[in-house]
Design a protein with these regions (language model features):
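Elongated, mostly alpha-helical coiled-coil "stalk/stator" tethers of large membrane protein machines
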Residues: 1-179
Length: 179
């Protein structure tokens, strides 16, 4: 995330915290992130040099006024005006990260070869909470390439204990060992 985009997310979250609107701002930015992802034409229009600032602001008002918190809409307009709107997905991720830090939430992406049972999910969640002292929020993914085991990703850290990793290590060992 660029320094400018980080500055925007820090400022918006700080303001939202002052007025007690953290949950609303988080919810709105997450919904907008989905909208921008699902409608790439919107980003194309907002980054176009052929469309005036005023027209972009009018478009944002028409699409989002009354549907998102006024601070979020103002930030969108500012990012458009400053030519930083391409950083909007990173901005939204920054808001989510600040919220998680503020509320003591550990966001963990869990990748397994097949879906975990409810019991496995609950055990993993409870164990992560015991270790971290934070509330664990799990995002579950399946990747058959794992073969077995789990890969956990959180706060820029990746912990992999998958059968695929073990097989890869064994392969390297065999290749580097001379007979």
């Amino acid at each position: 995330m660029s320094d400018k985009v980080k500055c925007y997310s820090d400022a918006l979250y700080s303001l939202a915290k002052e007025v007690g609107a953290c949950e609303e701002v988080l919810d709105d930015t997450q919904k907008l992130a989905v909208s921008f992802r699902d409608e790439p034409e919107l980003m194309r229009v907002l980054t176009s040099s052929e469309i005036s600032r005023g027209e972009k602001r009018d478009l944002l008002d028409a699409c989002f006024k009354g549907r998102v918190h006024s601070y979020v809409l103002s930030c969108l307009k500012l990012m458009c005006d400053q030519g930083s709107i391409k950083g909007f997905p990173a901005f939204c991720a920054g808001i989510k990260q600040l919220y998680n830090e503020d509320k003591g939430i550990l966001a963990v992406t869990v990748t397994s070869a097949r879906p975990l049972s409810e019991i496995q999910i609950e055990r993993l969640k409870r164990r992560l909470e015991e270790i971290s002292g934070r509330t664990a929020e799990l995002t579950l993914q399946c990747d058959s390439a794992c073969i077995g085991g789990l890969r956990l990703e959180y706060s820029g850290v990746s912990v992999e204990d998958t059968l695929r990793r073990r097989l890869d290590e064994l392969k390297k060992l065999i290749q580097t060992t001379s007979v």
